A protein has these predicted regions:
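A short glycine-rich, Lys/Arg-flanked "PGG" loop and its adjoining helix->strand segment in the class I
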Residues: 59-71
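A short acidic, Gly/Pro-enriched loop at the edge of an enzyme's catalytic core
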Residues: 34-46
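Short N-terminal helix/helix-N-cap motif within the alpha/beta-hydrolase-1
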Residues: 9, 56-60
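Conserved Rossmann-like nucleotide-binding pocket used by diverse enzymes
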Residues: 2, 29, 47-48, 76
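C-terminal alpha-helical "lid/dimerization" subdomain adjacent to the S-adenosyl-L-methionine
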Residues: 76-134
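C-terminal lobe and adjacent flexible extensions of AdoMet/dcAdoMet transferase-like proteins
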Residues: 134-141
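Class I SAM-dependent methyltransferase SAM/SAH-binding core
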Residues: 1-35
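A short SAM/SAH-binding and catalytic strip from SAM-dependent methyltransferases
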Residues: 45-57
Length: 141
């Protein structure tokens, strides 16, 4: 298991938790998802939780995840999508953007599904309030 986050603090917290749980097969790296320090096809599974709405270069992040995923591999995760909950959309615009936690532009559930379908052989996507969840399978070629 390889964990990567832009925040060194988050990686430190993750390392501490892994140590408490005596996990031995986990490595931690601080880095940018828009320029992943891994070889093409390095991973069977890529999991991204609550990240894409915060990434400054979303296009690079989508490309890099696809690049490091093995043929037949799975990309899954969840993140905020606009247009599902007016109250959440307001909060994102007026609070999270101003604090730098979220960075536009944001996907809608529809635009996310279309984007993922251009890259992956199969895409399953759903929403729970303003969060989209997805499971994608990369083609074998």
């Amino acid at each position: 298991i390889t964990c990567l986050d832009y925040s060194a603090d988050m990686m430190g917290q993750a390392q501490e938790k892994a140590d408490r749980l005596h996990l031995k097969n986990v490595t931690f790296r601080q880095g940018d998802v828009g320029a992943l320090p891994f070889a093409d096809g390095a991973f069977d599974i890529v999991l991204s939780l609550n990240g894409f709405h915060a990434f400054p270069d979303k296009e690079a992040a989508y490309r890099e995840v696809f690049r490091v995923l093995k043929p037949g591999g799975t990309f899954c995760g969840c993140f905020y999508v606009k247009g599902e909950q007016k109250r959440t959309d307001w909060f994102v615009r007026h609070v999270y953007e101003k604090t730098g936690f979220f960075t536009p532009p944001y996907e809608t559930a529809f635009s996310l599904k279309k984007r993922l379908e251009k890259l992956y052989a199969t895409v399953t996507l759903g929403t729970v309030k303003s969060m989209a969840w997805f499971v994608c399978r990369k083609g074998l070629r």
